[in-house]
Amino acid sequence: MQEYKELIKECAKELEGLMPEISQKLVNIAKINSPDRAFLEYLKVVEQVSLMKTERKQKNKALIILWRYGEALEKELYSDVKFFAKPLHKRIFRFVDWKIIGMLFLVFIILPAITSNLWSFRSEHYVLYLNENVDFPRELCNYRTSWLYDFRTSMVCVLKYGYGSINVTLRGNSWEKGVEAQRFISDMEYDFDRVKSPITYIQTPKETLRYKKGVCSDFALLVANILLDNNVSPVYIVHTVVRKEPSGGHAAAGIYVNGTLWILDWGSKPTKFQEYLENIDRIWEIREVRIYRITRDRITLERIYKARLEDDRWRFLYSVIIMLGIFILKRREWWIM
């Protein structure tokens, strides 16, 4: 029954150059006369090595040696093998597993959601004060195709030179007229089919009134036309340019009341400019907001709010995170370290 001592001594000798302190412990265990106690102490050594913080290859090699001799030791001492003779499951090579999928979800869904909330047009923009005169040759306004698809040119031909303008009488002060004009356009239908079209043309106020429907640019021109015709001057048109929007963005008319710019947009109540920006910012990624000041004889691009574009270096960071994450998750499976 002394064979178990010889097995432990052989294990100690094999570990002598790899882990001297563990080898010495095994030498001491080999002196124990009780087989059960010796086996129990051997198991404690295996556990100690598995929990050691040391170089991975060294630890793995030591565990392989301990496991091999432990299996032989258990067979020698007990007929019922249960500690070392468990079948090892074959490692299956998988390039993609749930850990990889979870990491990709974190990198491409969670992180962009967080960073998009951190970036906001309201906090990341600057203002250019231009007071730039906006004009277009009057004789060219006779040719509809010259301004049919350009909103800025359409403002000149419709609001300055009166092409396709209408006469609608409003009552009250400037605020009441603005509210009534906003209510007037909100009773019309929004032409979503035109929004989906790859090429969006501009309607005159007369056409919008005739069809009883339009898009944001049509309603902005209509409101500005009605208010100017009712001696509310100046009026403003706010043109918001957004990223990846086929129609080019959003337009709405506005008026100043008591020093505050109020936006008169289709389908909503009169809204303060800052609140309007917040609402747009939640829906689209704003690139710039152009403020046009309009009177009967002059249209001026008064100012532009321009976004400070986010840094694209995050794309490189994402790539590094992905490669590093795959390396960490799969290093054992690929036997990298």
Swiss-Prot record:
Q: What would be one Gene Ontology cellular-component term for the protein?
A: membrane
* Chief location: membrane
Please name the Pfam families in this protein's record. DUF553
**Name of this protein:** UPF0252 protein PH1321
Query: Which family does this protein fall into?
Result: Belongs to the UPF0252 family.
What is the source species? Pyrococcus horikoshii (strain ATCC 700860 / DSM 12428 / JCM 9974 / NBRC 100139 / OT-3)
Topology relative to the membrane: Single-pass membrane protein
For this UniProt record, the keywords arranged alphabetically read as follows: Membrane, Transmembrane, Transmembrane helix
Bilayer-crossing residues are: 100-120
**Superkingdom as given in the UniProt entry:** Archaea
